[in-house]
Amino acid sequence: MSGFADYQIGIYFDALTGTQSPYPMDYATLERKAQAAMSPSLFSYVAGGAGDEATQDINVTAFSKWGLIPRMLVGAEPRDMTVELFGETLASPLFMAPVGVIGLCTQDAHGDIATAKVSAETGVPMVASILMEDPMEEVVPYAGDTPNYFQLYTPKDRDLAASLVQRAEVAGYKGIVVTLDTWVPGWRPRDLSTGNFPQIRGKVLANYRTDPVFQQMIEGDESRVVMEWVSTFGNPLTWDDLPWLRSLTKLPLILKGICHPEDARRALDGGADAIYCSNHGGRQANGGVPAIEHLPGVVEAADGAPVLFDSGVRSGADVIKALALGATAVGIGRPYVYGLALGGVAGAVHVIRSLLAEADLIMAVDGYPSLADLSIEALVRLDGSHS
């Protein structure tokens, strides 16, 4: 049983002895305080999105178009938030989505390791970005028994792709998440206005620097790392590449960026084990549809296969709504990044426990004892359109 709601009781009792949490309880304050703790360029990179950031913004506000219907006399105690994913039982449906500059977001510039420690402490899985400050093999042991997954931006060089995936398998990652929507960077005015692109400056490339195939490509010349990375990054994959991707690993294969039902069906028919519905948090393409609006159709097309979701999740209420719309697991990005920036491991743990406490309390108050009780029938559209 969850017990996540107990986090709020602890906060109240701590206050009786004059101890107040140093970390914010709401997202807006968290973001504002994290901005003060981060360099302007790093905050801009994390906070920014594509174009005028309209899609990024509506990813967030779209959740307010759905409302959860309270059910009374249910006796929602205890509550069960466990979820089965790839043969593992997880204490909650929350996970930390991949963030390519997470390594830079702690004061010691070892944010990937810090995130793995958060994973161990909370039981919330981390999807580790390929873009790390520390090599993947040095990161995953810090996650302890919590399953972590490895995210791949598929390089043009197939031998390099195979090497990266094999390393992830050997290191102990439990699944491979292939991001499909970032074979070319989106138009991001915040970053363009300052020429801010961390990889071009040689940051977060530890997994390339430590790869034997990549070392062969640069012939051991470290001065070639950035240009070689630029030349091999970004493989415009097609459906014809899916059998090859499937052949790279026996681990669960999760395809990230799927927003159309037909794409979900083709992905699963082609050997994917799960769908990851996401529009990259609005960072890649402007002028789109809020990711949460795609979720019901993708879930229906997945026909029982796991569907992971992220984009715009800022609260426990958002988590509950995504679960009711059919997500198997729900990812957060900027919230835990800001927690790390503000307080390292402790800051991110606070963010995660706060989200889970709010979600647990909503299930209690509104009468939903388990995740199985949450469905699209538990929601109404507040904007007058049909669900």
What residue ranges belong to the model's regions?
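Glycine- and other small-residue-rich loops at beta-strand/loop junctions that grip anionic moieties
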Residues: 48, 104-105, 128-131, 150-153, ...
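C-terminal helical cap(s) of enzyme catalytic domains, especially alpha/beta-barrels
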Residues: 59, 291-301, 340-361
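A gly/proline- and charged-residue-enriched helix-loop-helix capping module
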Residues: 111, 121-142, 146-161
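Active-site-adjacent helical/loop segments in soluble small-molecule enzymes
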Residues: 367
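An N-cap/entry alpha-helix motif that binds or orients negatively charged groups
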Residues: 1-87, 195-237, 372-374, 380-387
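Glycine-rich active-site/cofactor-binding loop and its immediate structural neighborhood
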Residues: 90-134
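Short, conserved beta-strand segments within well-ordered enzyme catalytic domains
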Residues: 67, 73, 82-84, 93-97, ...
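Alpha/beta enzyme core
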Residues: 116-117, 121, 142, 156-309, ...
